[in-house]
Amino acid sequence: MYKGIAGSEGIGIGNVVIIEEHEIVIENKKITDTDAEIARLQGAIEKFVNDTNAMADRMEKTVGAKDADILRGHIQMLQDPTIEEQITALIVSEKITAEKALDQVLEQTAEIFAQIPDELLQQRATDFRDIKARILKILLGIEDYDISAAPAGTVLVAHDLTPSMTAGIVAENIAGILTEVGGRTSHSAILARAMEIPAVLSIDGICTSVKNGDRVVLNGTSGEAIVNPDAETEQKFAGLLEEYKKEKELLKKFAGVPTVSADGTKVELVCNIGKPEDAKKAVECDGEGIGLFRTEFLFMDRDTTPTEEEQFEAYKSVAETMKGKPVIIRTLDIGGDKEIPYLGLEKEDNPFLGYRAIRFCLQRTDIYNTQLRALVRASAFGRIKIMVPLVTGVDELRSVKAMVADIMKELDAEGIAYNKNLEIGIMMETPAACMMADVLAKEAAFFSIGTNDLTGYTMAVDRGNSKVAYLYSAFNPAVLRAIKRIIECGKKEGIMVGMCGEAAADPKLIPLLLAFGLDEFSVSATSVLKTRKTIADSSMAECKALADRVMACATEAEVQAVLAQQ
């Protein structure tokens, strides 16, 4: 059995087709005609843009505009004028080929993003390498395997499935996907989920462990795959596939109903989004609001910071789309670890612990004040709440509240409407915030637990480092105690406590969160109905009894053993 990351839920049974990567050899030679080389580069870029637009159009017809925009985003990334300028300058100054110059510039850019301790932003490294590989293949005349020709019952196996590869997939022919790299936030996972194809990612060495035609069964929910299973195992997976199909039908009855436990405890079930247009998906999937709107993506892939008006329109559009439902908007979570050229930030040795999020914002008040003004103005159009990331003490919260108070005075003088009862809360994601939760709860309007970073900081682990990734788990007793303390401190002061990390949708963790008293679960739009069903199947009495046993555990293994008995 092979174990990896559960990238896209579901059961798959089929035959292996390996997507082999062509070796790209770049000659290290000098050129004499730089104009001709620049023309080659521009021709390749033009073909790349045309091909990408065509792929995005096809993808839009099959999985929708939201996922097709991942590919269109590649065009925007490449059209950053500084990138082509750097490549052209290298061709002219170093007298090197278009291939060599392109490789150097895009690999340097990719490496910057790869060092960012944020899974969503690390994905940009994969994007830039996909762009680089595709343009290099155009320049070198290399053609890839046509995924659209894969026969029915195919399990695709690849080092990674880039957005451009995924665009060619005919969903009904693909039984599953296995890759050597990638996580739940990688584009291969996002697109697999959009096409409802089960996927297991980050299986080390899978490409060399299987051969074309091998029979594979996989469980994208548990992150497991078995190559050439015996008849009994394949029959078992066939049964699981039928059960999965029935469960999907069953989930439909959880649309349009409140999120309530089996014995009547009501909680809010809201969605995480990264772009204004994602709010429509949240509505379509029956989300009860927005629990996390990541605003940093408004600041990326451009040459200047977004204006107040640009931000105002983005926040307003989400508020209006949600029609009076709560919308929690996280202020800028960006800093020295992000390659945003116009910010002029220095690269840091340890950006995970560095100049980022609220630390950056309180020093760059010119940028932060603009964002806060846009947020306060947009609050007139819906139930917007402001959330401050990476807080470690009450002084940071007080500084933000003081800035907002000053902005409100300005808007009063200008005669501009806003919500005078605008709530300002905290992203609880550091051990410092956890230890100070009793103090912070007295001054914050709400808490939202960011389990991804809280787990990393609490366990002192970089989940991107395979040697220590085993330590990264929300089921570790230390992390569970941190979560429980934050919720208890919030409840004592009567404020709402939510969770917007991946753990909020984990069916094994949900009963514990209910027992702890979590008020709000913020999940991906596609996880709404499944999470609602898990909550509906849970009784508070049973959840509390389970939590008592779990909180008596000393190790993660003990926690998992208790949960396995349920």
Regions inferred by a protein language model and the residue ranges of each:
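Conserved alpha/beta-domain cores
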Residues: 248-566
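Non-catalytic, soluble scaffold/interaction modules
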Residues: 1-321, 327-334, 364, 368-372, ...
